[in-house]
A protein has these predicted regions:
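Catalytic cores of secreted/periplasmic or lumenal enzymes
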Residues: 2-327
Length: 327
């Protein structure tokens, strides 16, 4: 057993080591000024930022959509916009991706950039830059992105099995992230994106009403919170599969550390959320992020690393004219 206080001290040490090494992570063939001078008088990143700002005015949920889209794209075949491709048996058709939204928004940005400089800006880069802007505009960290990704030319539904499910146990999740080069601390950090996350009642119905066939709510969930969700968000006989926010009501769609406090209160919405705070391998990480101010910097590091996962550069892939179709 660790001495009292050793876990927080270890967390600070881990965070400092990770952040110190982040600048060199995975950026060899990407560049912060990749599109400089390549789109006439148009600034690619300004176009994306303006579009994100305008969308968030009336659709703040888009921050959740973009984060979800980025993670599900990058975790399968790398950050190559393969998730955007239409067609039978593509990643988009996989059950794991049924809740993804924001495709139309990426299309809108792509259309604007194609009008300014055809065949220059990749769909993969649009996802990365738009997500960065949405995070910052919703109160999260501002961080630099490197660009120069190219778009993938294949998309296969079965490869979505690389994605962890909302019900995955922590040991399995750690293994899945490790295969992609992420340690458990980075995994817990990325799960902090659930501070602006959303799900649907159908995903958590078993936790609310029939946990492990007991006919009762998951005992790890705060009983009052379970009652609130079953009474107001997910009542029996609802006509629609309602949206449920993954963070507390006072912090919905605000990018902060409150997600971790929510878990400490037994109010993790997804099974994997609450498991993060209960498994000995990660419980101390939840405590650490909830009680310190390291989360923004660690998240900036971890999502930057994710955004550089298995990227296609140089002559690999292509620059799609339409994000839904290969050229």
């Amino acid at each position: 057993m660790q001495p009292v206080g050793s876990a927080p001290r270890l967390a600070v040490l881990v965070a400092m080591v990770v952040l110190a090494s982040s600048a060199a992570c995975c950026r060899a063939q990407l560049a912060s000024n990749f599109y400089a001078g390549k789109c006439g008088n148009t600034s690619v990143e300004v176009v994306i930022q303006v579009a994100v700002k305008a969308r968030l005015v009336w659709d703040k949920r888009m921050v959740a959509g973009l984060l979800h889209l980025l993670f599900h794209d990058c975790f399968v075949q790398g950050c190559d916009a393969s998730l955007l491709l239409d067609g039978p048996n593509t990643e988009k058709t996989a059950p794991q991706n049924s809740g993804i939204f924001g495709y139309d928004f990426i299309d809108d940005i792509k259309s604007e950039l194609e009008a300014a400089c055809p065949g220059v800006v990749s769909c993969a880069d649009i996802i990365i830059a738009a997500t960065r802007d949405a995070i910052a505009l919703c109160g999260g960290p501002s961080y630099a992105v490197t660009l120069g990704r190219r778009d993938g030319m294949s998309s296969v539904s079965w490869m979505a099995s690389d994605l962890p499910s909302p019900h995955v146990d922590i040991a399995t999740a750690i293994g899945m992230f490790a295969k992609k080069g992420f340690n458990s601390f980075e995994m817990a950090t990325l799960m902090g994106a659930h501070t602006v996350g959303v799900t649907h009642c159908s995903v958590i119905d078993d936790r609310l009403r029939n946990f492990n066939g007991t006919g009762k709510a998951d005992p790890s969930m705060d009983p009052t919170y379970a009652w609130i969700l079953t009474t107001f968000a997910c009542p029996k006989g609802q006509a629609f599969d309602n949206i449920v926010y993954l963070d507390e009501p006072s912090s919905i769609l605000i990018f902060d550390k409150s997600y971790f406090n929510q878990i400490l209160s037994g109010r993790g919405v997804l099974a994997v959320d609450q498991a993060l705070g209960m498994d000995p391998a990660t419980a101390w990480m939840v405590q650490f992020f909830a009680t310190t101010d390291f989360f923004p910097a660690m998240f900036a590091h971890s999502i930057t690393k994710l955004a550089a996962l298995e990227v296609k550069t140089g002559t690999a892939g292509e620059i799609r004219r339409n994000c839904r179709l290969t050229n």
